[in-house]
Structures are given as C-alpha cells and as structure tokens.
C-alpha cells in the first residue's frame, strides 16, 4: 500500500481498516471552455467568476462544498472557528445566488463526460472516468489545498462471519481484485502495482493525471471528525440549497 493511505488520523496504527481507494477532490473542466490561466489564478474562486455563470456544477455534499469555500478563503477545511465557517457559508451563498450553479451528485459524471457544463467540483476517481470518456476534459487541484481522502474496509465487532470478511478483504487488496475494481470505476487503487500499471504505458488510464493523487502539497488535508462542526455545516448547507432554490 502507498504510505499516503497509512497512519491516517482515524486509524493511526493501521489496526482496524484496510484502504482500497484513495484520491482528492478537485475541479473537472472543459478545456474548450475554461482557460487554464483562470484556474491557476482563481483556484476555487473560479466558482464566483461571472464568465462561467450558469455553466457550473456544485456537488451536493456539505463536507466537500465547505472544503471548497474554506480553501478558497485560505482556511483549513478542519476549522471549528465560527467566524471562518460563517465566511465559508457566505461564500457559498454568494456562489448560488450569483452563479446559478446546478447542484448535483453522481449525475455530474455522465453530464461532464458529455460536456454539458464548463466545470464542476468532483472526486478524482470520477474525473478519471470523465477524462477517459472525453479527451476535452481536464482535472485541476488548486494550490490552496484540497481534501485527500481514502476509502477503507473494516469488519464490525458483531460480524457473523469474520473469516469470510477477512478473505474478501484479502481478495479486494490483492492485485487481481484491486485491478478489476480500480479499472472498472476509475478510482485510484491503494495497491502500488495496480496504480502503476493502470496509469503507465498501455494502461487503462495512461496519462490521465486525475488518477494520480497529489501528495506534495502542504495545504492538502485529511478530514478530521468533529461532531459539532459536522452538524453545523450540515445545517448551513441546507440553508445554502434553500438560497439556491429561491434564486432559481
């Protein structure tokens, strides 16, 4: 496994979980519509650029949307500072009131593959699929930072068949299972050899940079669970969506 998916805050000793996918959140964009210089200059603030009004997708996730807003403002996505969270809320309200975004979930994948919007917030694995389907699409991670995430398998304490569960985890982690899983959905495998083979010469995702998570940016973070902040952000995101519906 890659070092980047080991020793994470939720399992620092790697005792309870086995990662199988990992990646980032970033911006998928149509290279025929979006100037890369705009992305490099504005980062997430491109979602406030009137040039792209009515031509953007937001992802219906309070966690990722607030990550985007907080990073656009120069803050940590793990902040519990009330004033910073309020600023991020105001940023998102400004976005939905002035930019007329479409707030979506998984439909962003096929829609961006078909070039229906100029840009959107997306998971790197979904961006890999989009770019694999449409060569006019690109993936950009702002220098201000992003969420570096991983998906992992765990076994509940009350599991009825832990031996079978361990066997499945072993299968999903070994080369063949990990290769099939990653190549089918486009999400980056935590298995080093699988990742190398899928990205390398002749691989399914050869040359698609979205498939290679960024590991060298000091502003990238792993989410830390905070129950109170989670509740607050969830409530504020509901208000953002109400503001969006009232605007539309």
Segments predicted by a language model, with ranges:
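Mature extracytoplasmic/periplasmic domains
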Residues: 147, 151, 156-218
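Extracytoplasmic ligand-binding site segments that recognize negatively charged/polar headgroups
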Residues: 1-113
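Sec-exported extracytoplasmic/periplasmic mature domains
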Residues: 49-53, 70-75, 93-97, 113, ...
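Conserved C-terminal helix/tail region of periplasmic/extracytoplasmic solute-binding proteins
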Residues: 110, 213-248
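Periplasmic-binding protein-like
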Residues: 86-95, 133-157
């Amino acid at each position: 496994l890659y070092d980047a998916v080991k020793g994470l805050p939720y399992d620092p000793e790697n005792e309870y979980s086995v990662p199988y996918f990992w990646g980032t959140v970033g911006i998928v964009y149509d290279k025929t519509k979006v100037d890369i210089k705009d992305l490099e200059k504005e980062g997430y603030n491109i979602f406030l650029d009137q040039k792209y009004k009515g031509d953007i997708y937001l992802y219906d996730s309070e966690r990722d949307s607030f990550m985007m807003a907080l990073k656009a403002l120069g803050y940590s996505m793990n902040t519990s500072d009330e004033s910073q969270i309020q600023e991020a809320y105001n940023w998102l309200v400004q976005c939905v009131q002035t930019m007329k975004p479409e707030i979506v979930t998984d439909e962003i994948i096929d829609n961006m593959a078909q070039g229906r919007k100029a840009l959107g917030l997306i998971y790197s694995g979904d961006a890999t699929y989009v770019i694999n389907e449409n060569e006019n699409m690109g993936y950009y991670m702002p220098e201000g930072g992003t969420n570096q995430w991983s998906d992992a398998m765990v076994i509940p304490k009350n599991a009825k068949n832990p031996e079978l569960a361990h066997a499945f985890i072993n299968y999903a982690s070994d080369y063949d299972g990990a290769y099939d899983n990653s190549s089918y959905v486009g999400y980056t495998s935590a298995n080093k050899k699988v990742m190398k083979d899928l990205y390398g010469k002749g691989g399914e995702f050869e040359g698609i940079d979205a498939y290679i998570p960024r590991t060298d940016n000091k502003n990238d973070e792993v989410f830390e669970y905070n129950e109170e902040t989670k509740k607050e952000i969830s409530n504020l995101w509901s208000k953002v969506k109400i503001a969006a519906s009232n605007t539309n």
